[in-house]
Amino acid sequence: MAAMVVGALRRGTATAGGSSRSFARSLPRPVSTLVVAEHEGGFVKPSSLSALAAAEAIGKDDNRVSLLLGGSGPGLHKAAEHAASSHPLVSEVLVADSDVFAHPLAEPWAELLRSVQHKGGYSHVIASSTSFGKNLLPRAAALLDVSPVTDVTSISEPRVFVRPIYAGNALCTVRYTGEDPCMMSIRSTSFSPTEAMSEAKVAPITQVDLSFLSEGSSGKSAWVNLKSQDTERPDLANAPVVVTGGRGLKSAENFKVLEQLAEKLGAAVGATRAAVDAGFVPNELQVGQTGKIVAPELYMAFGVSGAIQHLAGMRDSKVIVAVNKDADAPIFQVADYGIVADLFEVLDELLKKLPDKK
């Protein structure tokens, strides 16, 4: 009888132990998020503020959010002050003050991200899907031995995300089942930045320990220079109005007419890959799957046929106006307003009717 009781107790203990392990596995993991931010002119870039909005979508109540900035000089510290009051969820701003991080080279930044992750133990790491984020995230993920989730457009649960596939023609829901951290890049056009807080709440600013840096930290790449257009027009990725030209404009000279319209509207100028490949405009103006992803309030397309790769980069625009003499052009399938006409006649009429921007 005693043996039966002891056996039952042993079986009960074993079952209870298994249940406790199962229960432990089912417990929700604590959420903490590291946002890798970019800055310019002493301010956090809008794309990084969108990454903060994505962090809020992961968890609002129990989410410890740290924001990582790198670089050197007064601009970095001014940006850190801006970051400290940029979002109510930001609990700490981490600053890596070194000339090594003054330029967006993936090798030293990946080492920095690995070091910060090892010390912070974050459950999530977020970067915006900019050229910098796309370059950094895979390398850092490889160093941390995890698989990144890219181009996230929506967050359903802390580890369930939606991302576009097939050039934006389908949406895929993915669940991250790997080890921490869950690393992801987000489309900034899909997450609206939160308005700046009052100065009443300011997160502390902490210097990152850079003792991990060595002479080989810069890797096999070196910064050469940065070339940018000298223009007063807004940045293409964040402009509220975008005027885009395609191969139908026929020449670089005709793109100047489009630029006149952009000046009247206070808009950014974009281009299709065909226009870029033809040499009409530089490639930094390319909108599409392999160019800039935009979602302005107003998107005007002149002489754009609507190739699938181009539509992937602008289909989230609030209002789309298309002008093309081909009534069967695919661009009309996504346009809110379509004009089947000669684009040069339409441009001429618009330039006559629209007042100059003050």
Curated annotation (Swiss-Prot):
Residues involved in FAD binding: 298-326
Subcellular location: Mitochondrion matrix
GO MF, any single term: electron transfer activity
InterPro entries registered for this protein in UniProt: DHS-like_NAD/FAD-binding_dom, ETF_a/b_N, ETF_a/FixB, ETF_alpha_N, ETF_asu_C, ETF_asu_C_CS, Rossmann-like_a/b/a_fold
GO cellular component: mitochondrial matrix; mitochondrion
PANTHER family: ELECTRON TRANSFER FLAVOPROTEIN ALPHA (PTHR43153), ELECTRON TRANSFER FLAVOPROTEIN SUBUNIT ALPHA, MITOCHONDRIAL (PTHR43153:SF1)
Subunit structure: Heterodimer of an alpha and a beta subunit.
Family the entry assigns: Belongs to the ETF alpha-subunit/FixB family.
Annotated protein name in UniProt: Electron transfer flavoprotein subunit alpha, mitochondrial
Gene: ETFA
